[in-house]
Amino acid sequence: MEAILESMSGISLEEMDAIKLMNRVDTKYLTTKAVLASVIDRASQLYRVLETGGERICGYDTMYYDTGGYQMYYDHHNRRLTRQKIRTRRYLSTGGTFLEVKRKNNHGRTKKKRIEIPDAEFMSFSADDAASRFIESKSAFAPAALFPSTATGFRRITLVNNARTERLTVDMDLRFRNLRTGVSAELGEAVIIELKQDGYCRSDIKGILLDLRVKPLRISKYCVGTVLTEPSVRRSRFITKIRMIEKLTNTKLLKR
């Protein structure tokens, strides 16, 4: 797969500016690294690969914040259509660190707002007045009510179609650590693919994934990571998806 990525046409961060898709429709898929190699091979002439810092597979660290009672987790678990997630994200290839608010509305669209913050505030931004004002203006939560919850690390491939109308992110080597319980977990060979578009429209990658029997699946890295690392949360909605990951990777993730 690495050789195929190196053979593809690249795209820079500057060129990506026109297709940030901060207000978008997301479609997620679950597969394995073995199948991913075939996906990348078939997409190699139709998509360009993001290159940052000379790398085409880039590392990301993310810290998800939540209330003491995991309100954002339960909003998702309880199928609330309008919900938010708040996180800090560190881009290891570029060195940038951002505070982000993701909002999903009842029409299935995702809007993301973010500001850059000092890297020292990755684990806590509450002392930063500008960051606190950002949270107050862009989210439904008070900064004082938020606490570090689930840390998530992964490696990502980002593809952009030649028409520059969509982006595809491929997250692998997913690992989680709960800051409250100290419990860690990994997803092994599992890969989460996310197609990001302005709306529901034709996409070459949808045909490639369908041909390889990779079907859409609604899945949240934060919720999966929380289920695997926080024994006290209710998890009934996510159990089926955890079992799907276990079956796909032949790895036991959760005690029965």
Model regions: which residues?
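Phosphate-end processing signature that detects enzymes handling 5′-triphosphorylated RNA
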Residues: 1-256
